[in-house]
């Protein structure tokens, strides 16, 4: 019985480990997911935004006390508008997903939700980190030597 508890704990802890992508690994995934060039947003811009939002960490979570919302995952997608965390007042959930889906090692749902975000009029400007760190900058270094 004790061995089963230990095994269960080990399996549970393994399933909640954060994935921190290496930059070329993430660049290849974003390219193969048709995010590169989506709505005119280059792969370099996506990479810059993801680095400055989460440092490529799938389990990044940041609480915003001003509006009681939380940003989730590699793209730091906000619970006020895009996902449901069950605690953000007046949440819209425009992506139609639980915020926990944005914390998965498999970032397929995060990519789909990011595509939904950029379809709005703000586009990539919805991400403050992109505005502060990426907009109107030379971003070529984000994919240099990645073969993408």
Swiss-Prot record:
It is found in: Secreted. One of its GO terms (cellular component) is extracellular region. It catalyses: Hydrolysis of (1->4)-beta-linkages between N-acetylmuramic acid and N-acetyl-D-glucosamine residues in a peptidoglycan and between N-acetyl-D-glucosamine residues in chitodextrins. It is an enzyme of class 3 (hydrolase). Keywords: Antimicrobial, Bacteriolytic enzyme, Disulfide bond, Glycosidase, Hydrolase, Secreted, Signal. GO terms for molecular function: lysozyme activity. Disulfide bonds join 24-146, 48-134, 83-99, 95-113. It comes from the Eukaryota. GO terms for biological process: defense response to Gram-negative bacterium; defense response to Gram-positive bacterium; killing of cells of another organism. Its EC number is 3.2.1.17. It holds the Pfam family Lys. Its main location: secreted. Residues 1-18 form the signal peptide. The active site is at residues 53, 71. Residues 19-148 form the C-type lysozyme domain. InterPro entries: Glyco_hydro_22, Glyco_hydro_22_CS, Glyco_hydro_22_lys, Lysozyme-like_dom_sf. SMART domains: LYZ1. Lysozyme C is capable of both hydrolysis and transglycosylation; it also shows a slight esterase activity. It acts rapidly on both peptide-substituted and unsubstituted peptidoglycan, and slowly on chitin oligosaccharides. Belongs to the glycosyl hydrolase 22 family. Lysozymes have primarily a bacteriolytic function; those in tissues and body fluids are associated with the monocyte-macrophage system and enhance the activity of immunoagents. In the intestine they may also have a digestive function. Monomer. This is Putative lysozyme C-2. It comes from Rattus norvegicus (Rat).
């Amino acid at each position: 019985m004790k061995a089963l508890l230990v095994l269960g704990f080990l399996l549970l802890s393994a399933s909640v480990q954060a994935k921190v992508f290496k930059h070329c690994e993430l660049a290849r995934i974003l390219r193969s997911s048709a995010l590169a060039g989506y709505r005119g947003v280059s792969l370099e811009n996506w990479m810059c935004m993801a680095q400055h939002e989460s440092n490529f960490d799938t389990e990044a979570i940041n609480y915003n006390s001003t509006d009681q919302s939380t940003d989730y995952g590699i793209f730091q997608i906000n619970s006020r508008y895009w996902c449901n965390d069950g605690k953000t007042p007046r949440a819209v959930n425009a992506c139609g997903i639980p915020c926990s889906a944005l914390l998965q090692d498999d970032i397929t749902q995060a990519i789909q939700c990011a595509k939904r975000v950029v379809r709005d009029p703000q586009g990539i400007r919805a991400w403050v980190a992109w505005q502060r760190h990426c907009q109107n900058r030379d971003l070529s270094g984000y994919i240099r030597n990645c073969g993408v």
